[in-house]
Amino acid sequence: MILKKGAEADLYLEDFKDVFGFDFYNEKIVIKKRVKKNYRINEIDDMIRGFRTVKEAKIINKAKISGVYSPVLYLVDLKEKSIVMEYINGIRLKEHFSSKGLDKKIGFQIGKSVGSMHKAGIIHGDLTTSNMILSDGKVYFIDFGLSEESEEIEKQGIDVHLLRQALESTHFDISEELFKIIIEGYSDVVGNKKKDEILQRIEQIEKRGRYRKRD
């Protein structure tokens, strides 16, 4: 069953048994398959999709090792350019905050997880509440398709800046207080000095954005 069609990849929901030939606690799995681009030369397209598939799988695994809740990887299929992973059964934080309002405990969890990723040299690249799932009281991060490995303060600042923009766009009524709580969780992992550096960098990023709009 198709879950989502995207510009870069399609997501499918399947039974574990149908893919691997045996049952595993009635588990369901997600298959993320990168879309072939007909405008590219076949060999180049295969190389790009293969590289991005391996890169994403590697970063998901690195995030999990770093203590960030993320899907378990079952298989990386280079021939099909796909990742077979655990299906996280829960509610997206987009819906959770929309129905429950401000949730300080969850906000703090988000901050700690983002801090853990940055401390491990991971830039998620798409930190929205649509890419976070609440399951059994834990916040799982999904869709690492735009992620990369970097410890650059600029890229970390952009990561957090885009998260704040996503909160303001989707959860305007609680975004300011929620972002403060997220930053508290972030600081709990990376420390006050690093937290201050990130906030200063976000200010610089926002100033650059305002200057571009004037131009």
Regions found by a protein language model. Name each.
Residues 2-54:
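ATP-binding glycine-rich loop module of kinase domains
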Residues 13, 28-32, 84, 141-143, ...:
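Short hydrophobic-acidic sequence motifs that mark active-site Asp/Glu residues
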Residues 13-16, 33, 75, 87, ...:
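Conserved hydrophobic "DFG−1" position in protein kinase catalytic cores
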Residues 25, 77-79, 135-136:
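Structural motif
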Residues 35, 49-53, 64, 68-110:
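Conserved structural core of kinase catalytic domains
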Residues 62, 66-68, 94-130, 135, ...:
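Conserved kinase catalytic-core helix
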Residues 140-215:
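C-lobe/activation-segment region of protein kinase-like
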